[in-house]
Amino acid sequence: MSSGRVLVLALVLSACLFCGCISTDRPASSKEPGNVNVVATTVPLGHFTEMVGGDRVTVAVLVPPGTNLHTFEPSPSKLAEVEDADLYVKNGAGLEIWMERIIQANEEMLVVDSSSGVDLIESTDADDHGHGAHDFHEDILTTDPHIWLSPKNAIIIVDNICRGLTEVDPENAEFYQKNRDHYLSRLRELDGELNSTFSETDRKEFIVLHPSWSYFARDYGLVQVPILESEKEPGPRYLAEIVEVACEKRITTIFVDPNFNPKSAEIIAEEIDGRVVPLDPLAEDYIENMRIVGREIASSLDG
């Protein structure tokens, strides 16, 4: 065989390998050629991954927007999304109780625990997350999984994601690190803004339907007062206590998570002649959303 024909054959074989015509240990991926295929548990984690990965990553989110994180179960179609992933970004902190099923769907992908290095909050089953004064509940320690709702934690999470991308795609390490550094500077700026905002508020207590904001409260010296008891609708005694706290602390705003039934919040708001305001913990544009959250909570403390 001539050297020319050998060269042509080699080029054809190389092209087949690149296009997936020759099977490898991993199934063919539908991702953009050359991209790192990433699946993230939540919309914010997917957003962080895109901020670091830029056009070098293709990101899918496992838990769809508008879904209750605490009741979500991955369907077969969702598990199929994981099969081609190079990297899975999990929330950690006990959120993904179904994580073993994710790993079984793709044992070769790298799993990044975004909670690694975060100072986790342990709380009672009453969901007071260290910020309430309700001692009549059964004390069962759990871990608060809402770690991303703290700009300080977000800095740690973004760095964890960058490490994961660098491990699976070392050739683009400098690209990921540059994007990470740029986004971290924006997160630090956000943290500074929020520190300044809440240092000027005299009152610190705010009432929420679902206790998503424990880490946010810890960051800025606030006191979160939750309505829901362990994902269950509260009884009359607990509702009466919340109303008493609201009157004592001059609270007139009840913050609700759009993914939860607002009925209890509306009852309390009516009792205190207050208002119900939504705060979305899963909004896609993290920095803009946290600025909105900061403005709304600060406004409620000044009212």
Predicted regions and their residues:
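Secretory targeting signatures
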Residues: 1-31
